[in-house]
A protein has these predicted regions:
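P-loop NTP-binding module
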Residues: 1-193
Length: 193
């Protein structure tokens, strides 16, 4: 099965899911893949602040409420094949918008125009938005920050994703603290001195 729509989520805030989403999108665009990033973190988006000088750009929430068209909310990046749809203004009902038919239609249309649609969603450990979106997509990538997530919490988030029917494509382990080198440092030190 082809993978086109991919959700990127985490267990908690500040684990690097937005940065991971943007880096993956840039890498795919550099491979001449047409990529759309949708910022579906309508509750606490940071993507617009990092990627545009426009103040409060229209985005996903305006599209899903019918206030503007998709075309008006696509922002071109420095990469020819990479576009971003920002979250837009905070709506009173993000889960309702993401679980509705308009969002499903948006994904279907995006799949026709792009090779990959990467969807940045809120942390699944905080709200249910990620599971709602994951149920509509081809797969999910879970970003886990080293020493920030307890094992039990990670397992609970993975279970929520499985219950949503989402295929877990993989885990990105982020913010790994560089250690002393462990076993391999000792091995090479003894072997090559």
């Amino acid at each position: 099965q082809d993978i086109c729509t991919v959700v990127i989520t985490s267990c908690n805030e500040n684990e690097g899911k937005t940065t991971t989403t943007l880096q993956l999108a840039k890498s795919l665009a550099e491979l001449d893949k047409r990529v759309l990033v949708i910022d579906a973190d309508m509750r606490k988006s940071v993507m617009a602040g990092r990627n545009t000088t426009a103040e409060n750009p229209a985005g996903l929430s305006e599209v899903l409420t019918g206030l503007t068209s998709v075309k008006e909310c696509l922002y071109q990046t420095q990469y020819e094949d990479l576009s971003i749809m920002f979250a837009g203004k905070y709506p009173p009902n993000p889960v309702e918008l993401l679980s509705g038919q308009y969002f499903e239609d948006l994904l279907k249309t995006a799949k026709e125009s792009y090779d990959y649609v990467l969807i940045d969603v809120p942390p699944l450990g905080s709200v249910i938005d990620a599971a709602v979106v994951a149920a509509k997509c081809d797969g999910t990538i879970l970003v886990i920050s080293d020493n920030q997530v307890r094992y039990r919490q990670a397992i609970e988030v993975i279970e929520q994703l499985r219950k949503s029917g989402s295929k877990i494509l993989g885990v990105v382990r982020n913010n790994i603290k560089k250690k002393d080198g462990g076993y391999y440092k000792k091995y090479y030190k003894n072997r090559y001195q």
